[in-house]
Regions:
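Conserved HGGG/HGGXW glycine-rich cap/lid loop of the alpha/beta-hydrolase fold
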Residues: 8-57
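Active-site loop/oxyanion-hole signature of alpha/beta-hydrolase fold enzymes
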Residues: 39, 49-86
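Gly/Ala-rich beta-loop-alpha elbow adjacent to hydrolase catalytic centers
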Residues: 89-93, 97
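Flexible "cap/lid" loop of the alpha/beta hydrolase fold
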Residues: 102, 111-137
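Active-site nucleophile elbow and catalytic-triad environment of alpha/beta-hydrolase enzymes
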Residues: 141-156
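Short beta-strand/loop motif that positions the catalytic acidic residue
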Residues: 160, 166-168
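Conserved alpha/beta-hydrolase "acid-adjacent" motif
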Residues: 173-178
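Catalytic histidine-centered segment of alpha/beta-hydrolase-like enzymes
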Residues: 197-206
Length: 224
């Protein structure tokens, strides 16, 4: 399916029934990274798995920023008349979900943030250096966005009042201090640092991801 917004065509897959959960992938990926997770969620949830602008089957554009992607998500939620969906974002998708919850809190019901960072300085130093080198050889809007955005402050996190699950690997390219800052500044946040996992290993292993998020999702259902 396609949603049209800002002169762009945004692809999304919709399946299942029940409370709505929106899945947001990371940089350079598309919605299929969640393929097996979608199968687990669909019997219990209405799943909306989105391809971000300039990714997957969505329109190509050089207008790439976390702000633009956040506006895309807000438009999608409003346009599809989704009522305070759960937002599950990985990496760039987690940044977008977090920015939406900060800027338009009425649009989100809960957050699952996997591998998010607040600023480029939140990446481990070796990761920043590697990205700069890669950008020098192969400059792209995607790489430029990662090197200069986002710019989220701890004070902004205080605006997030919805239930939030924060995930990161113990070997993540996001600095541990950054993940702790996110979790400690969101008032209803639950934190899990996953031993032995890197930035995306537990995401690619959708079965593991499902086991990680099930208790959190079940808790939301008990409080509805």
């Amino acid at each position: 399916m396609f949603f049209y917004h800002d002169q762009l065509r945004l692809y999304y897959q919709r399946c299942g029934s029940g409370p709505v959960i929106v899945l947001l992938h990371g940089n350079g990926e598309d919605h299929t990274i969640f393929a097996n997770l979608i199968e687990q969620l669909a019997p219990l949830y209405t799943v909306i798995a989105v391809d971000s602008r300039d990714h997957g089957q969505s329109s190509r554009t050089n207008r790439l920023s976390y702000d633009a992607m956040t506006a895309d998500l807000a438009a999608l939620i409003t346009g599809l008349e989704l009522e305070q969906p759960i937002l599950l974002g990985f990496s760039d998708g987690a940044i977008v979900a977090l920015q939406l919850a900060i800027r338009q809190p009425q649009l989100a019901g809960a957050l699952i943030l996997a591998g998010a960072n607040l600023t480029p300085q939140g990446l481990r130093r070796y990761s920043r250096v590697a990205f700069r080198v890669a950008a020098g050889y192969h400059p792209s809007p995607k790489m430029a966005m990662m090197l200069h955005e986002p710019q989220i402050t701890p004070a902004m996190l205080h605006r997030v009042a919805i239930p939030t699950l924060v995930l990161a690997g113990s070997r993540d390219l996001i600095a541990r201090k950054e993940t702790l800052t996110i979790a400690t500044n969101i008032q209803n946040a639950e934190l899990h640092i996953l031993p032995g996992e890197n930035h995306n290993s537990y995401i690619k292993d959708n079965a593991k991801l499902w086991q990680l998020i099930r208790p959190f999702l079940a808790g939301l259902n008990r409080t509805d």
